[in-house]
Amino acid sequence: MNVLFFLKPKDEVEFIYNTYSIRQVLEKLDAHGYSAIPMLDQEGHYVSTISEGDILMYIKNNQQLSLKKSENVCIDKVEIRRAINSINITANMEDLLERVMNQNFVPVVDDFNHFIGIITRKDVIKYFYKKNGL
């Protein structure tokens, strides 16, 4: 089975750019009810995944930061505490399953590290659930 079977394409996925402000990211997370979101550079390369926890730690360590001030702080200033690794479009199912066990979603990139979408743990579980008649 090919991992592309599970792919949710980029145009159906929320993501941010590493040039966004902390406030823009917080608002996007809040608007969509996410706790983490893929981050891309301006060329569309996958950079990392930023989480609410990463932002909270940044705020904790920069207590003078207000919501207003967060409009002027770029999200790339926030340290990523837990790497969410991507897989290549040519990855095998074993690679996907290894990652999806530990991540809610797995970013998928092409050979040039361009972000092409995500695979969610929910979709993988749903497939195997239906396949086994549960």
Locate each region found by the language model.
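Bateman (tandem CBS) regulatory domains
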Residues: 1-13, 70-83
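The conserved cystathionine-beta-synthase
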Residues: 15-34, 40-41, 59, 84-103, ...
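Short, well-structured hydrophobic secondary-structure segments
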Residues: 35-39, 43-52
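Short hydrophobic beta-strand motif reused across regulatory alpha/beta modules
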Residues: 47-55, 106, 117-124
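A short, polar/charged loop-to-alpha-helix boundary motif
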Residues: 54-70, 124-134
